[in-house]
UniProtKB/Swiss-Prot annotation:
<keyword id="KW-0736">Signalosome</keyword>
<keyword id="KW-0963">Cytoplasm</keyword>
<dbReference type="InterPro" id="IPR000717">
    <property type="entry name" value="PCI_dom"/>
</dbReference>
<comment type="function">
    <text>Component of the COP9 signalosome (CSN) complex that acts as an regulator of the ubiquitin (Ubl) conjugation pathway by mediating the deneddylation of the cullin subunit of SCF-type E3 ubiquitin-protein ligase complexes. Required, indirectly, for activation of ribonucleotide reductase through the degradation of the protein spd1, thereby supplying deoxyribonucleotides for DNA replication and repair.</text>
</comment>
<comment type="subunit">
    <text>Component of the COP9 signalosome (CSN) complex composed of at least csn1, csn2, csn4 and csn5 subunits.</text>
</comment>
<feature type="domain" description="PCI">
    <location>
        <begin position="249"/>
        <end position="418"/>
    </location>
</feature>
<comment type="similarity">
    <text>Belongs to the CSN2 family.</text>
</comment>
<dbReference type="Pfam" id="PF01399">
    <property type="entry name" value="PCI"/>
</dbReference>
<dbReference type="GO" id="GO:0000822">
    <property type="term" value="F:inositol hexakisphosphate binding"/>
</dbReference>
<protein>
    <recommendedName>
        <fullName>COP9 signalosome complex subunit 2</fullName>
    </recommendedName>
</protein>
<dbReference type="InterPro" id="IPR036390">
    <property type="entry name" value="WH_DNA-bd_sf"/>
</dbReference>
<dbReference type="GO" id="GO:0005829">
    <property type="term" value="C:cytosol"/>
</dbReference>
<keyword id="KW-0539">Nucleus</keyword>
<dbReference type="GO" id="GO:0005634">
    <property type="term" value="C:nucleus"/>
</dbReference>
<dbReference type="GO" id="GO:0008180">
    <property type="term" value="C:COP9 signalosome"/>
</dbReference>
<dbReference type="InterPro" id="IPR050871">
    <property type="entry name" value="26S_Proteasome/COP9_Components"/>
</dbReference>
<dbReference type="GO" id="GO:0006974">
    <property type="term" value="P:DNA damage response"/>
</dbReference>
Length: 437
């Protein structure tokens, strides 16, 4: 599964110097005019805007005036957009210190800080992000704002996942679980459920990377117990994908198919490219469940049937459903890059081949009372040993009734007891009819 869970495309956070600065205006006319004049400069002349905003900060800071807070927030944003990261961190640290001013409401300061965190998280400079998150979390520990702390820690956790820094990630997990515990009343019940699901989705990504299937199963079961939540669809996509993989490991193909379908719909709703990967898994589970329904018949999946990244799976399922072994093997060979490069799919390819061979084998032996294994092997284009293995599996699963003569390499069909009984009754009836004529 993908480790990138930044949600840039899924959440429309406006960072274009939002107009929420206008909701705390006090009658400082000269400062107010200077502030709006500075804002008018930032698009065409950001350097001049910076100088002007700094003058406001120096003029109003001693009075703990909200205009100083507003100006410093604009300075922080401009520095970030100009990629002046050191200057941005300096102004940001200063801004964090202003959040305790009595003139700044808790909701306004929280909204302002989180808006900066949200946008800065899109930065690709990992060295800057490490410093930025460190500055933010240290400051928030002193602000006693657990709601904001939780939202920020989610961003930090996503960043640590992309860096595969699992040691720090696990430390953050403990912090976030404490914040989301039932004993903590700072988070509303509905929000707690939503945050829990997001936290589980992050954990699932980490434990998927390190292939801890036991922990993944526990997380999946825990996520299903969360009832009061309105999660982002991508979060549900991750959780349902995990569920599908868990069912696949236990050979529960139909359940896996259901979970992959739900995962696909969630990723699709979120506009995530992960929908393509999970759609391949859905097709895989569909074949292994030996379903007669084409997975591309549904209105949700049909638009992707001819997608260049899906066409290999489209051809594969079509060949599979008409039991064309030769075509299945040819498609697997031709589209190795699209199919076998996925580690998850690759581990089930042998099961696909076994499944289709078994289905064809069942049809092949039906006309016979006994048949040479060599004949079956020739018709399927495989070795006698593969035929033996397939027949043994079918006998164990009670899909065919017969026995294998390993010495003479012959498979003999055994009639079910009720069939033998019915045949005997029919034969006796014929004898009686003949005798009484």
């Amino acid at each position: 599964m993908s480790n990138d869970f930044m949600l840039e495309d899924d959440e429309n956070y406006d960072f274009e110097f939002e107009d929420d600065d206008d909701d705390m205006i006090e009658p400082y006319v000269d400062v107010e005019n200077c502030y709006y004049n500075s804002k008018s400069l930032k698009e065409e002349n950001p350097e001049s805007a910076l100088t002007s905003f700094y003058s406001i900060v120096e003029k109003c800071e001693g009075e703990q005036n909200e205009w100083a807070f507003k100006a410093l927030k604009q300075i922080t944003k401009i520095n970030f957009q100009l990629k002046k990261y050191d200057d941005m961190l300096q102004s940001y640290q200063r801004l964090l210190g202003y959040t305790n001013w009595l003139s700044i409401t808790k909701n306004y300061s929280e909204k302002s800080i989180y808006n900066i965190v949200e946008y800065a998280s899109s930065c690709e400079n990992t060295e800057f992000l490490e410093k930025f998150y460190d500055v933010t979390t240290k400051a928030l520990q002193n602000l006693n704002n657990e709601r904001l702390m939780l939202k920020v820690l989610m961003h930090v956790a996503r960043f640590l996942l992309t860096q595969k820094n699992y040691h720090k990630f696990k430390y953050l997990l403990r912090q976030m679980h404490e914040l989301l515990s039932d004993e903590n009343n700072s988070v509303a019940d509905q929000n707690r459920g939503t945050h829990l699901l997001e936290l589980y989705s992050l954990e699932i990504q980490m434990y998927s990377d390190i292939e801890d299937n036991k922990r993944l199963k526990e997380l999946y079961q825990s996520s299903l117990r969360v009832k009061t939540a309105i999660p982002h669809p991508r979060i549900m996509g991750i959780i349902r994908e995990c569920g599908g993989k868990m069912h696949m490991q236990e050979n529960q193909w139909s359940e896996a198919q259901t979970n992959f379908f739900e995962s696909f719909k969630s990723y699709d709703e979120a506009g995530s490219s992960d929908r393509i990967r999970v759609l391949k898994y859905l097709v895989l589970a569909n074949m292994l469940s030996e379903s007669e329904i084409n997975p591309f018949d549904s209105p949700e999946t049909q638009p992707y049937k001819d997608n260049p990244h899906i066409i290999a799976m489209t051809k594969l399922v079509e060949a599979y459903q008409i039991r064309d072994i030769t075509a299945v093997e040819r498609i697997l060979q031709t589209y190795q890059h699209d199919i076998l490069d996925d580690d998850f799919i690759r581990q089930y390819v042998d099961k696909i081949l076994y499944s289709i061979r078994s289905q064809v084998l069942i049809e092949l032996v039906k006309p016979y009372t006994s048949v040479k294994l060599s004949l079956l092997a020739k018709k399927l284009g495989v070795s006698i040993s593969i035929i033996e293995q397939a027949l043994v599996g079918l006998i164990i699963d009670e899909r065919v009734n017969g026995k294998i003569d390993m010495v003479n390499e012959v498979f003999t069909i055994s009639q079910p007891k009720n069939t033998i009984h019915n045949q005997l009754v029919e034969d006796v009836q014929k004898l009686w009819n003949t005798a009484t004529k």
